[in-house]
Structures are given as structure tokens and as C-alpha cells.
Swiss-Prot record:
A GO BP entry: fatty acid biosynthetic process
Pathway where it operates: Lipid metabolism; fatty acid biosynthesis
InterPro entries with a match to the protein in the record: Eno_Rdtase_FAD-bd_dom, Enoyl-CoA_Rdtase_cat_dom, FabV-like_NADH_b, Trans-2-enoyl-CoA_reductase
Family under the similarity heading: Belongs to the TER reductase family.
Protein name: Enoyl-[acyl-carrier-protein] reductase [NADH]
EC number(s) stated in the UniProt entry for this protein: 1.3.1.9
Catalytic activity as recorded in UniProt: a 2,3-saturated acyl-[ACP] + NAD(+) = a (2E)-enoyl-[ACP] + NADH + H(+)
Enzyme class: oxidoreductase
Keywords attached to this entry: Fatty acid biosynthesis, Fatty acid metabolism, Lipid biosynthesis, Lipid metabolism, NAD, Oxidoreductase
Taxonomic lineage from the root: Bacteria, Pseudomonadati, Pseudomonadota, Gammaproteobacteria, Vibrionales
UniProt keyword Lipid biosynthesis, yes or no: yes
Residues of the site described as Plays an important role in discriminating NADH against NADPH: E75
Length: 400
């Protein structure tokens, strides 16, 4: 079939398998160009490995460190009539390129919150790798089905206390609007922590540990975003921030557990990037369009891949073997360049000046839209979008 982008809200409902494969290819090339990562882990599990930072982690581990990788994700395969999800095609492309390099790659597709996912992963590690040296936890799911009860819990992207009103961009109409978001109820806050907090990360590490599949010195990392006062009302000070604070709580508990065998657990605070997750958060697209332009001008812009490469090579697995620098909460900070005072001041000054008319001149909004479409495999250089493509792409993946 010939596949064109179809946008609904902040989701593109179609995906392009060849475009997704080309994206992965580019990320691999970027990783290889950096040269091998010294002291890199050799057996890596990535929970949430099909897009964004999770995919970048798997690519970095495999193509920067030569690691055997297991990826866990929840994606849909394409059919004769309908394309699959971008994450399916990303994972298929990763698997193809890893195997071409002679790297071990296996994937599990299903609900990572489930007990079955954890058990199947443990069985696979025991069978193929024995143990693992690194666990990356990178789930970005809006819902969680509780394994014991089957109850489905939903998260909320809402402020706490009062209605939040701010200048935002309507990405469908390319227009500046006033966005208002009602505050979360106590139950919504609690539910957001249940879905997006640290509990499931703990359940994963505890299950892996009890099964004896964590090697001595195993490191685990989960991803977070803090941002600045421009996004705090909806993010860090909102329901989502409560969940991210719960990740910090989990990291402390897990670090204590793993330190007994020479391991570590850290939250890595990353910069804002264009992902399906961030596009759903009010004000984030406008903020990203602003901050990207300034960071590009300053020569410090990074995408997912550059961020994770820096986390591996300059934080967790440094060439000299020294411990990673952390902040007062034991977090790895990769948002340091974004949070530079000159960059943030620029955004603060610019925010009130942006109008629908000057949006494309004052910010990198055009690039934001391009990056967004690229997530789904569209607008990628070197891809013929008028060519007939097969939406059915198979690879080495087992259903959970």
C-alpha cells in the first residue's frame, strides 16, 4: 500500500515502515560515529524499548557497546490493510540491523506491567544470557492494568490545586491559543503515581533479583523530566510530577538493594524532546519549539540518541571507570544544557511575544512538526513516499 500521514489530535494514525527503519538506521549511524563506549554493559534489558529514549538506549547498548539486548514493549503489527505502530517497525528495524552485526537481539511484545511479562523475560534471560548487567526502565504508558486485580488505572496530565492557563500552540491549526487545564482530583493524582511512578520499576528489579538474573554490579536507570518554571505547573508541580517524585523514592530503595552487590539505581533526568508522550502535554510543544531553536543556535541541541549516548559515555560508563556525577537526590542530570540560565531566560522573554503570525519565525515550530512526523516514519530523507510498501513486517519477537 501507499501510506501517507493522517493526524488526529496529537497522534499520527498511520506509520511508514520504511521511514521508521530509516530513522533507526540514522540513530545507529550516529552511535557508531561516536566510537565504542568503554566499559559498556554486555547484556542489557530495556523495558519500553520501542521508541523515544527506550529505543535510543537499546541502540546505544547494542551499537555503542556491543551488547546483547532484550527489549520489552507493547506494539501492534501491521496487517495487509493497516500499518502497525511505529514502535513495531522501529523494533523490527533494530532487530534486523542488530542481527546483521551478529548481535544477540530478542524482543517480547505485551503488557510490561503484567506478571507474565516479568516471568517471560526472566525465562528468556536464564535461557539465553544467564544474567544481565543493565536494566533500563523507560515505560511511557497512560494506563496500567493492575496485575493482581485486573483493574485498569489511568493517569492524568493535570495541574494540582488550581486551573492552569497558559499560552500554548494548537498543533492541528498551527495557531497560538490560551490553554486551560482543570486541576487533578486527589484520586487522579494517586492514579497517576500508580501508573507513572516507581512501583512497577521496583517490581521488575525485585523479580529479576529474586530470580538471580541480575549480575553483580548491575546498574538500573529510569527516565524522568523536571524542566523549569515554564512547564512546572503542568509537569513537575502537577500530577505527573508526583509520579516522577515517586520514581526518586523507588531509586533510593533500589539503590540500597543493588549496592549490596556493587550495583546502582538512578533516575536520569533528561532534556525535553519530541516524542508521542511530550506532544500530549499542554504547553510542551511550544516550549520545545522555543528551547530547540535557542539550543541549536548555541550548539548544544541534542535528540534522544545524543542524550543517551552522553548518559552512557559520560555518566554511567565513563572511560576512566569513575562513578557518575549525581545531584543531591542521586539523579543523573542530562538536562544540564537545557537548563542553562541564558537558554531559559531566552524562553522566558520569548513566551509572551509569540503569536500565530510570528510562531514560525521566533521558534523552531516547523522543525517541531517535522520531528513529530518523523516519529511515525514520515518526512525522512531518502524515503520514496509514493512507492508501494508492505505494512506486514515480521521479526524475532515473542508475544507475552
Amino acid at each position: 500500500m501507499i501510506i501517507k500521514p493522517r493526524i488526529r489530535g496529537f497522534i499520527c494514525t498511520t506509520t511508514h515502515p520504511v521511514g521508521c527503519e530509516q530513522n533507526v538506521k540514522e540513530q545507529i549511524a550516529l552511535t557508531k560515529a561516536q566510537g565504542p563506549i568503554a566499559n559498556a554493559p554486555k547484556r542489557v534489558l530495556v523495558v519500553g524499548s520501542s521508541s523515544g529514549y527506550g529505543l535510543s538506549s537499546r541502540i546505544t547498548a547494542a551499537f555503542g557497546g556491543g551488547a546483547s539486548t532484550i527489549g520489552v514493549f507493547f506494539e501492534k503489527a501491521g496487517t495487509e490493510k493497516k500499518p502497525g505502530t511505529a514502535g513495531w517497525y522501529n523494533s523490527a528495524a533494530f532487530d534486523k540491523f542488530a542481527k546483521e552485526e551478529g548481535l544477540y537481539s530478542k524482543s517480547l511484545n505485551g503488557d510490561a506491567f503484567s506478571n507474565e511479562a516479568k516471568q517471560k523475560t526472566i525465562d528468556l534471560i536464564k535461557e539465553d544470557l544467564g544474567q544481565i548487567d543493565m536494566v533500563v526502565y523507560s515505560l511511557a504508558s497512560p494506563v496500567r492494568k493492575m496485575p493482581e486485580t485486573g483493574e485498569v488505572i489511568r493517569s492524568s496530565l493535570k495541574p494540582i490545586g488550581e486551573t492552569y492557563t497558559a499560552t500554548a500552540v494548537d498543533t492541528n491549526k498551527d495557531a497560538i491559543i490560551e490553554a486551560s487545564v482543570e486541576p487533578a482530583t486527589e484520586q487522579e493524582i494517586k492514579d497517576t503515581v500508580t501508573v507513572m511512578g516507581g512501583e512497577d520499576w521496583e517490581l521488575w528489579i525485585n523479580a529479576l533479583s529474586e530470580a538471580g538474573v541480575l549480575a553483580d554490579g548491575c546498574k538500573t536507570v529510569a527516565y524522568s523530566y523536571i524542566g523549569t518554571e515554564l512547564t512546572w505547573p503542568i509537569y513537575w508541580d502537577g500530577a505527573l510530577g508526583q509520579a516522577k517524585m515517586d520514581l526518586d523514592r523507588a531509586a533510593t530503595a533500589l539503590n540500597e538493594k543493588l549496592s549490596a552487590t556493587g550495583g546502582t539505581a538512578n533516575v536520569a533526568v533528561l532534556k525535553s524532546v519530541v516524542t508521542q508522550a511530550s506532544s500530549a502535554i499542554p504547553v510542551m510543544p511550544l516550549y520545545i519549539a522555543m528551547v530547540f531553536k535557542k539550543m541549536r543556535e548555541e550548539g548544544v541541541h541534542e535528540g534522544c540518541q545524543e542524550q543517551i549516548l552522553r548518559m552512557f559515555s559520560q555518566r554511567l560508563y565513563k572511560a576512566d571507570g569513575s562513578a557518575a556525577e549525581v545531584d543531591e537526590k542521586n539523579r543523573l542530570r542530562l538536562d544540564d544544557w537545557e537548563l542553562r540560565e541564558d537558554i531559559q531566560q531566552h524562553c522566558r522573554d520569548l513566551w509572551p511575544q509569540v503569536t500565530t503570525e510570528n510562531l514560525k519565525d521566533l521558534t523552531d515550530y516547523v522543525e517541531y512538526k517535522e520531528e513529530f512526523l518523523k516519529l511515525f516514519g514520515f518526512g525522512v530523507d531518502g524515503v520514496d513516499y509514493d512507492a508501494d510498501v508492505n505494512p506486514e513486517v515480521n521479526f524475532d519477537v515473542a508475544d507475552i
